[in-house]
UniProtKB/Swiss-Prot annotation:
This is Phosphoglycerate kinase. One of its GO terms (molecular function) is ADP binding. Pathway: Carbohydrate degradation; glycolysis; pyruvate from D-glyceraldehyde 3-phosphate: step 2/5. Belongs to the phosphoglycerate kinase family. ATP binds at K196, E313, G342, G343, D344, T345.
Length: 389
């Protein structure tokens, strides 16, 4: 099914309500990481170029519905946009209508302060819809939530469409999952098999090769009968790890880096996976394992990456993730299509300076994983319904 795209619409003189993801970290009234705002700026510029009367909104943090507090305000985002050269102002009371002039952007205050937002209240949804001629959903990061500003408004707005950012996410994920160039490789890291089990299941059916990292890999190591000492792993999920290993090719580390404490000053010792003692914890893969994975990565034509292979935040347990990251960048330079998503993955990409060497970096955490699992994203589903009558 297809969606209407904002890029295809005539927006001249139209009131356009953009639901963006401007949920950025703020300290002492200043934005401390601007990645999400920067990702939204091309959408705002395009709407202005098309002659629209532009309103944009987002959630920020976790406010209590019906109780506005200054720390929940989108004012720091407004200040940032002013600094970027936009004619922009904040509207706090907007549910009964707001005046928007051509050439300006009106930021509508934090949607999660509005009563009924999270429960997708129809009355609130209708109020949002009444503000606009065109609703633009451009927040992939919240597309897995059916809320008034992501789903309800799309039911009632005269026109509901996908913004450039959302459209690009869907296209990139579709390219990786629906028609991947072979061989397709999926890299899934993280602390627990239990939180990624459905992702691993779905990917085992699509990918030619699956790489697991972090605490997930420890469960697979234990499933092979090795001692994992005090490592984070899930004994009750060993049968699941064994089942998945039969379905698809999952390489288990042959060597690891261990420590006796979880800290950046802990002594890091490299050893065979068969030699881990009862007092040690596995915090990274060893050089042999990292190079084996790098070889697999370099031969892949499609790479989906979610999660590191070790505790890369600590310099003493960083090497495995660094080797894997650089191999993904190398494969991409040689023509592979790579897509990365998830907070830890993005932090690793920043740390190793490979942002421009990945084909597509997803802005969604939970939404990215749910899409990979094959779940229907409510905010996308309603756009498809509206586009197809």
């Amino acid at each position: 099914m297809s969606v209407i795209k904002m890029t295809d619409l005539d927006l001249a003189g139209k009131r356009v309500f953009i639901r963006a993801d401007l949920n950025v970290p703020v300290k002492e009234g200043k934005v401390t990481s601007d990645a999400r705002i920067k990702a939204t700026i091309p959408t705002l510029k395009l709407a202005l170029e098309k002659g629209a009367k532009v309103m944009v909104t987002s959630h920020l943090g976790r406010p209590t519905e019906g109780e506005f507090k200054p720390e929940d305000s989108l004012q720091p985002v407004v200040d940032y946009l002013k600094g970027a050269g936009f004619n922009v102002r904040l509207a706090q009371d907007y549910l009964n209508g707001v005046e928007v002039n051509e050439g300006e952007i009106v930021v509508l205050e934090n949607v999660r302060v509005n009563k009924g937002e999270k429960k997708n209240d129809p009355e609130l949804s209708k109020k949002y819809a009444a503000l606009c001629d065109v609703f633009v959903m451009d927040a992939f990061g919240t597309a897995h939530r059916a809320q008034a500003s992501t789903y309800g408004v799309a039911e009632f707005a005269p026109v509901a469409c996908a913004g450039p950012l959302l459209a690009a996410e869907l296209e990139a994920l579709g390219k990786a999952l629906k028609e991947p160039q072979r061989p397709m490789l999926a890299i899934v890291g993280g602390s627990k098999v239990s939180t990624k089990l459905t992702v691993l299941d779905s990917l085992s059916k699509i990918a030619d090769q699956l790489i697991v990292g972090g605490g997930i890999a420890n469960t697979f190591i234990a499933a092979e009968g090795h001692n994992v000492g005090k490592s984070l792993y899930e004994a009750d999920l060993i049968p699941e790890a064994q089942r998945l290993s039969k379905v698809t090719n999952i390489p288990v580390p042959v060597d690891v880096r261990v420590g006796t404490e979880f800290s950046e000053t802990a002594l890091s010792t490299e050893k065979s996976v068969a030699d881990v003692s009862g007092e040690e914890s596995i915090f990274d893969i060893g050089d042999k394992s990292a190079e084996q994975l790098a070889d697999i990565i370099r031969n892949a034509k499609t790479i989906l990456w979610n999660g590191p292979v070790g505790v890369f935040e600590f310099p003493n347990f960083r090497k495995g993730t660094e080797i894997v990251s650089n191999a993904i960048a190398e494969a991409t330079a040689n023509g592979a299509f790579s897509i990365a998503g998830g907070g830890d993955t993005l932090a690793a990409i920043d740390l190793f300076g490979i942002k421009d060497k990945i084909s597509y970096i997803s802005t969604g955490g939970g939404a990215f994983l749910e899409f990979v699992e094959g779940k229907v994203l409510p905010a996308v589903e309603i756009l498809e319904k509206r586009a197809n009558g």
